[in-house]
Amino acid sequence: MPNIVLSRIDERLIHGQVGVQWVGFAGANLVLVANDEVAKDQVQQNLMEMVLAEGIAVRFWPLQKVIDNIHRAADRQKILLVCKTPKDFLTLVNGDVPVTRINVGNMHYAEGKQQITKTVSVDDQDIVAFNGLKSAGVECFIQGVPTEQAQDLYKLL
């Protein structure tokens, strides 16, 4: 079973909060970005890699590759798994990726979205995905940085 130390939804994927604060807090030594678009975008990958400290490995995999390969992870790999959307995590969970808790970070406001906290806005598609995660027994909590108090996302929907 893969050693996933933290699963996080963050539209920015890897940035300062994730690359420094969450990696350190979780004790991760591998950041696995599960995103179909970024897996094909070397420029985005290079920018994200610059944020990570020396010694932290990173992989940029499409969702299906994560589903197909996550169970081959070595025990020594302490994985911080990050996706852009709850729909992506629902795809992973439905593909038997062992995710039981998701830290919800940045989901920015846009037309058609409802702001539920200062950093999290959701639309109907997000709510459907979160309800699917809830049905699968996945806990979802909002916490921007490790020093903030976590909030139960489901109570805010």
Across the structure, where does each feature detected by a protein language model lie?
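Long, hydrophobic N-terminal alpha-helical segment
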Residues: P2-A57
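Structural motif
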Residues: N3-S7, N29-L32, A57-R59, K78-L81, ...
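A general structural motif
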Residues: D10-I14, P62, V122
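Generic hydrophobic/aromatic pocket-lining and core-packing "Φ" positions
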Residues: G19-V20, F89, F130
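Short, ordered loop/turn segments at secondary-structure junctions
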Residues: N35-V38, L63-V66, P86, G105-Y109, ...
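Short basic, glycine-rich beta-strand/loop surfaces that mediate nucleic-acid
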Residues: L47-V51, G55-R59, N69-V82, Q115-S121
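Ordered, amphipathic secondary-structure segments that act as subunit-interaction surfaces
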Residues: W61-G105
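Glycine-rich, aromatic-bearing surface loops/beta-hairpins
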Residues: G95, T100-L157
